[in-house]
Design a protein with these regions (language model features):
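Conserved PLP-enzyme active-site core in the AAT-like
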Residues: 4-296, 300-324, 328-343, 351-369
Length: 369
């Protein structure tokens, strides 16, 4: 019988992994989360009467200094509702850096569901659009230019370049350009709490520079599912309408919202541990394979590895690591590893042992060639 699904080969062979570094989305609920889920007070989110969902939305909005929040199943849905909120209909243009989640994974979603197109810029290894680039995009090329930018979208941390943090002063500069042009700013803050932990800047201070933002409960914070879109109270009704329109109105969603409350409360406190382990992992891989890791790029919980030094194709290296019990994936032509709630020091040791074995095999192959 045929099945609907996506075949990802070794990227999906989780049962064989001793340590799973593919993403911070692979975490299992903690015991506290499981208890909270079992005991959650629930209602029907479609009718807006699930008390646990409503409490989660309120606390998430408070955490980032916004007035209202909408709990939805995925980060993609949160972003798409957030973008759509700013437009009355289709036919709008959004400025953003190339390679962001919204301009890659979600690019066709925006086109199909909201009639939104993107004007992208090459942000290079930093990953974010800067104020000068934003100003250039907002300036019409000619008098009758129909390609008018209606919104600027940013991401923090920037996953495509290894979880780099957009400096607050850079975000403020982009916000000023947007304000001067009268256009809003939306933040894909899937890992905003990682950005806050790494920079020492409160998440609410980052969020103050944007009109709307979303963040994931199911990435670094460790919840099993869910993201929250946050913004001003006067957008809350329309956000709820779009949530229903996009199929995001849950039923007894308090069951998963209960885990989200624990993730929101406890998750940010321990993100620095993920960052420290990512640094240790990066330094170890760089030692085993000199030149394979740009340590200056390792700011949060991601490590990108250039496999050129291995002398084997990237996908072959991923399969070899999987055979050694280490789950990894790839991004931008490099192997990507992400530390998270379920990766401890022992797991980092397992990963480093695998990389050292890989490096030793390359040396041995070179000696016998």
């Amino acid at each position: 019988m045929a099945e609907w699904g996506i075949g990802v080969g070794t990227l999906g062979a989780m049962s064989s992994f001793r340590v799973d570094l593919r993403s911070d989305t692979v975490t299992k609920p903690s015991e506290a989360m499981r208890r909270a889920m079992a005991e959650a007070e629930v209602g029907d989110d479609w009718y807006d009467d699930d008390p646990t969902v409503n409490l989660l939305q309120e606390r998430c909005a408070e955490a980032v200094g916004k007035e209202a929040g909408a709990f939805v199943p995925t980060g993609t849905m949160a972003n798409q509702i957030g973008l759509r909120l700013h437009f009355s209909g289709p036919g709008h243009l959004v400025a953003a850096a190339a390679g962001l989640h919204v301009t890659s994974v979600e690019v066709m979603t925006a086109a199909a569901l909201a009639g939104i197109a993107y004007r992208t810029v090459d942000a290079g290894p930093r990953g974010w659009i800067d104020a000068e680039q934003a100003a250039q995009l907002l300036e019409p090329d000619e008098f009758y230019d129909v390609e008018v930018i209606d919104l600027i979208s940013v991401e923090d941390t920037v996953g495509g370049v290894g979880g780099r943090v957009m400096p607050l002063e850079e975000l403020r500069a982009v916000r000023k350009v947007a304000n001067d042009a009268g256009v809003p700013v939306h933040l894909d803050g899937a890992r905003i709490f990682n950005a806050a932990a790494a920079s020492g800047v409160d998440a609410a201070e980052i969020a103050a520079e944007v009109d709307t933002l979303m963040f994931c409960l199911s990435k670094g914070l460790g919840a099993p599912i869910g993201s929250v879109l946050c913004g001003p109270a006067d957008m809350a009704r329309e956000a709820r309408r779009l949530k229903i329109l996009y199929g995001g109105a849950w039923r007894q969603a308090g069951i998963v919202a209960a885990a989200g409350l624990i993730a929101l409360e406890e998750g940010p406190k321990r993100l620095h541990e993920d960052h420290e382990r990512a640094r240790h992992l990066a330094e170890g891989v760089a030692e085993a394979l000199p030149g394979s890791v740009d340590l200056e790029q390792v700011e949060t919980n991601m490590v990108l590895v250039d496999t050129e030094a291995l002398g084997m194709p990237m996908l072959e290296a991923i399969e070899r690591l999987a055979s050694l019990g280490v789950g990894v994936t790839h991004s931008g032509g490099k192997i990507r590893m992400v530390t998270h709630f379920d990766v401890d020091d022992t797991g980092i040791g397992v990963a480093l042992d695998a990389w050292r074995r890989l490096a030793a095999e390359v040396v041995k192959k070179g000696e016998t060639a």
